[in-house]
Every structure is written in structure tokens, then in C-alpha cells.
């Protein structure tokens, strides 16, 4: 009579491997059970998700610019239509100009300029913390590169 393992074409499991797997599962369960459901939002990987919309107060306070003379030749980067003289355009902090009917729907979905990706503040505290962490890491990397560059000069 063939053994169970021969009959099912498998190998007996390694008890040590099984113990490690069970320990990892128990660790994951205990961590998950101690997490508050609000903390689960902190697990979001913002580098692979769309950023939240721009803060409503920031969007409302964006400067409105009246198009004058030479600016009338400029085009809205979203719809590619030229601005009319005396028309009011919204100016982003990066100084790009847009028709309000073009940029307002965009900013209601994401917080960045469609041209240069300049980011406006959001109402999402988790995302803002992610932005601050990302900026700190970039500053740290920059200081480290400068330190390495200055080491032998």
C-alpha cells in the first residue's frame, strides 16, 4: 500500500517551517487586533494612490488674474483655448494660469498643478503627514549627499 505522501505526490511538511509560519500568523493577528480602525488609514501607500483633493479654502483663495494685453496670447494648458482679454483666470502658486472651468474640477479630484505637479495643501491629515515625511527624507538624503561630497575636499 502506498503512503499518503506518495499517493498525493507531496512531501511531508517540515515541523520547524510550520512553527515559524504559525508564529508569523499569530504576530500578524495580534498586531491587527491591537490596531484601531482609524490607524488602518496610516497603512495607505500614498506613492501608489492618487493624492486627495486640494483643500477647499486653499482653492477658494487662489488668486484671480485679469488677462491683459500680451497675456491674451497665452493658452489654458487644459483646454488649449486662448485667454480672452479682460477674462479672469485662476493663477496657481506655481504661476500657471487656467480657466476656472478647467482647473476647479481638476483640483476637486487631486491637489496638484496639471503641468508641473506643484502640490497644494489638502484637508487629509494622513496625506499631509506623508508629505512632511517625504520632504524630511529628501532633506536627509540631500544632506547625506552633501556630506559625502564634502568629505574629501
From Swiss-Prot:
CDD domains noted in UniProt: RING-H2_RNF181
Biological processes annotated in GO: protein autoubiquitination; protein ubiquitination
Modified sites of kind Phosphothreonine: 153
Tissue expression per record: Widely expressed, with highest levels in liver and heart and lowest levels in brain and skeletal muscle. Expressed in platelets (at protein level).
MF terms (GO), sorted A to Z: ubiquitin protein ligase activity; ubiquitin-protein transferase activity; zinc ion binding
Disulfide bonds: none
Record field: catalytic activity: S-ubiquitinyl-[E2 ubiquitin-conjugating enzyme]-L-cysteine + [acceptor protein]-L-lysine = [E2 ubiquitin-conjugating enzyme]-L-cysteine + N(6)-ubiquitinyl-[acceptor protein]-L-lysine
InterPro entries: Znf_RING, Znf_RING/FYVE/PHD
Family assignment from sequence similarity: Belongs to the RNF181 family.
Subunit annotation: Directly interacts with ITGA2B and, as a result, with integrin ITGA2B/ITGB3. There is no evidence that integrin ITGA2B/ITGB3 is an endogenous substrate for RNF181-directed ubiquitination.
Protein name: E3 ubiquitin-protein ligase RNF181
Designated gene of the protein: RNF181
Amino acid at each position: 500500500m502506498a503512503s499518503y505522501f506518495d499517493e498525493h505526490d507531496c512531501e511531508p511538511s517540515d515541523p520547524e517551517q510550520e512553527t515559524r509560519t504559525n508564529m508569523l500568523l499569530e504576530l500578524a493577528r495580534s498586531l491587527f487586533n491591537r490596531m484601531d480602525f482609524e490607524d488602518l488609514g496610516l497603512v495607505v501607500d500614498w506613492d501608489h494612490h492618487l493624492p486627495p483633493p486640494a483643500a477647499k479654502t486653499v482653492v477658494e483663495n487662489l488668486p484671480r488674474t485679469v488677462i491683459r494685453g500680451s497675456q491674451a496670447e497665452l493658452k489654458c494648458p487644459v483646454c488649449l483655448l486662448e485667454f480672452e482679454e479682460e477674462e479672469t483666470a485662476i493663477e496657481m502658486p506655481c504661476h500657471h494660469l487656467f480657466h476656472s472651468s478647467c482647473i476647479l474640477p481638476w483640483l476637486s479630484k487631486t491637489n496638484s498643478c496639471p503641468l508641473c505637479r506643484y502640490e497644494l495643501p489638502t484637508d487629509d491629515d494622513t496625506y499631509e503627514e506623508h508629505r512632511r515625511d517625504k520632504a524630511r527624507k529628501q532633506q536627509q538624503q540631500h544632506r547625506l549627499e552633501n556630506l559625502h561630497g564634502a568629505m574629501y575636499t
